[in-house]
């Protein structure tokens, strides 16, 4: 099992380096690997995804380094729920209210809304730390839906 600090430590690490391979070895499944299509013409370069569907985790690499990690706390996009710990507490136990109680006021965030281009946008908050950002999204009942760790350049 990987700990929350293992995931934070892995951010920014090389795709084929020992930190990342050590992380993968602790998953009980092989990843489904994909890349963003060339048609996206992303100025930041392609993103390579390692999808651990049964574990509820997706790793995104840009320029060969771990850029972000999505934790699907609730079943979504074919992913099973991530059933491990987030910040020392079972992922499914977090709510928007107790995130604020534990972490304080977020650096950014917004209420749920419907966007004309992308559709439903869930309530979210973002905390900025020295080496990474933490973004949390919540379902309509206020329960944690998805967590993303994002490496800082």
Predicted feature locations:
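Short basic alpha-helical hairpin corresponding to helix-turn-helix/winged-helix-like nucleic-acid-binding
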Residues: 60-86
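A cross-family detector of function-defining hotspots
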Residues: 2-65, 90-153
